[in-house]
């Protein structure tokens, strides 16, 4: 009699195919000069935006923020999470959050990039909803890196924060 052994689900390893990272469309424009921009310069540009200083840098940053906010608003409408559109984040709210957090991810404390060149850049800034049953509102959002935002999924934010802190402690020892 022939014996067939089937592997258990946990024994099956998934092969992750590394895709080539694509450049964002914006970087092909002549206005894109942010290939190696420092964190300090990004911080200065945010301050200039808040002070209503209009120059090429602030215009591009504001356009980038508006683009993300438009996407977040679309997500919220699709999931019917925003009842009052006045509660939705605006550019000024995002700029204040970026200053308050000093461009650091809420969870892993990594410096987030405002000007990034690759699609799905892991350390690009995102607006993370603390409670996923509500939309991208001022009282419900923090700045996080894309990596933490995607890996948290629907986990309770305090639990995820604790997990990240423990990982940082383990790395240091």
Model-derived features with residue positions:
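Polyanion-binding and phosphate-handling cores
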Residues: 95, 112-115, 152
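Mixed-charge, low-complexity interaction segments
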Residues: 1-76, 93
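Histidine-centered nuclease catalytic patch
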Residues: 110-141
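Short, cysteine/histidine-rich loop/knuckle motifs that typically chelate Zn2+
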Residues: 106-109, 147
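Residues that form generic nucleotide/phosphate-binding pockets
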Residues: 53, 97, 163
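Short pre-active-site segment immediately N-terminal to redox-active cysteine/selenocysteine motifs
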Residues: 104, 141-144
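Short, charged surface segments at domain edges that flank catalytic/cofactor-binding sites
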Residues: 56-107, 133
């Amino acid at each position: 009699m022939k014996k067939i052994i089937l592997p258990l689900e946990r024994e099956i390893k998934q092969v992750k195919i590394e895709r080539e990272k694509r450049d964002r469309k914006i970087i092909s424009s002549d206005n894109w000069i942010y290939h190696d921009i420092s964190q300090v310069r990004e911080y200065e540009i945010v301050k200039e935006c808040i002070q209503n200083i209009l120059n090429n840098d602030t215009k591009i940053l504001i356009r980038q923020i508006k683009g993300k906010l438009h996407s977040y608003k679309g997500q919220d409408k699709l999931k019917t999470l925003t009842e009052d559109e006045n509660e939705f984040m605006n550019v000024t709210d995002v700029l204040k959050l970026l200053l308050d957090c000093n461009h650091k991810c809420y969870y892993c404390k990594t410096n987030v990039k405002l000007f990034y060149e690759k699609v799905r850049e892991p350390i690009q800034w995102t607006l993370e909803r603390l409670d996923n049953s509500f939309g991208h509102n001022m009282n419900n959002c923090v700045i996080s890196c894309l990596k933490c935002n995607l890996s948290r999924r629907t986990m309770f934010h305090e639990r995820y924060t604790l997990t990240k802190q423990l990982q940082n402690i383990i790395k240091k020892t």
